[in-house]
Amino acid sequence: MAWYDNAVFYHIYPLGLCGCAHENDGQAVPGAFNKLNAWAEHAADIGCTAIYIGPLFESGSHGYDTIDYRLVDRRLGTNAEFKDFVARCHARGQKVIVDGVFNHVGRDFFAFQDLKANRENARYKDWFCDVNFWGNNEYNDGFSYGNWGGFNLLVKLNQRNPEVQNYHYDTIRFWVDEFDIDGIRLDAADVLDFDFMRGLRRLANEVKPEFWLMGEVIHGDYSRWANPEMLHLVTNYELHKGLWSGHNDHNYFEIAHTMRRLQGLCHDTRLYLFSDNHDVERLPNKLRNREHIRHIAILVYTLWGIPSIYYGSEFGIEGKKEWGSDWPLRPCLELSDFKDAETTNPVTSVYAALGRLKAELPELTDGEVKELQLTTQCYAFARVLDGKACVVVLNNGDSPAQLEFQLPVEASSAKDLLADTVGAQPVLTSMEWGRMKVQLPSNYATILQLEK
């Protein structure tokens, strides 16, 4: 099994966490990488075995308008400091993944500066898409060009140009040689050229054993991107939507159907599971009942896939988009403000417990998913491996509920694995004639380990 198959990710948006200037002023936040290292240590303490950190490299503003792929953003520090950060993570047993923003660059990228200066005679004009010297734009460049999402700040690269491909391939080799990273999250993979991604997979197989490629894909048939020829997996935005809307609408059918469909569609490829990230609002701002944060955390860790936590979400923090700005989703935080959270905060307590369980119980990672009971307000499924099983039980209703289902394995009793978490409630179970009954409190969820 590759390292990423049983990984638990911790996602850090470093420019936000460290409180960097929103526009690059070239000034480093003092001690930024010391702070990032402390957060990576915290992630290890709650069971996260991999750090996804990004965007990381020199840019003009939010990190995705890249200026220099081979220079750590000066607002954060230096290449040497990032190299040390990776080494410290590796010493703790954590892998490190960075953002690969290969679809577009910022306007200060060297090749685009050449295009602005030399127009039709530019050495690098073919590095960009849809360049039209008869057009113009809001910057009054005297030409127009392809972009991402309608934003001319993000200049679309021509990934079918062999020079562009080789430039990116060499960048990845540099990242591995210089920093010893373990993989890449491909930004905007849903608009990347497929042949380019095939080339990335061939390169990944060469640069480092088990070098990992994850693609940011919102909609579509995920198996087009996640397959043996291209990416190892993609982001599961389809489930992300179902996780919060399925609770708001009291509709577990949405979540169960999504998982069944995706497992069949992707041939059991493990997708990247998340409840929130740097682009979407935090759970407390999307849920009608914040008690359901517990349910969603449990689902992210127990459904088929690779779980992740976005920094701060383990503390239940809020984050809501403002008009034209995602910065409220990417706040500056201090660990010292959460020093007692694991023993006082119900959200932190359950995330820490889930991290421990994920490490201790292989059935939660590799076990077959067996659906046991499904209604609009109640959901029960098991993860079964080698005769052992953990049963996940959830009730999103405002009244207590009784679940009853066939036991997935032979058992005589059940242990509540989350009974010691902050805010835990008693769950009554009984077994008879191969069937199990569970009495669940209202708006409550837990994991039961079956025992013979």
Residue ranges, per PLM feature:
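Solvent-exposed beta-strand/loop surfaces of large extracellular or lumenal domains
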Residues: K415-R435
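Loop/helix patches that line or flank the sugar-binding groove of alpha-linked glycan CAZymes
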Residues: A2-N6, E23-N24, A28, A256-H257, ...
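Active-site-proximal helices and loops of the catalytic beta/alpha 8
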Residues: R92, Q113-K116, D187-H267, L271, ...
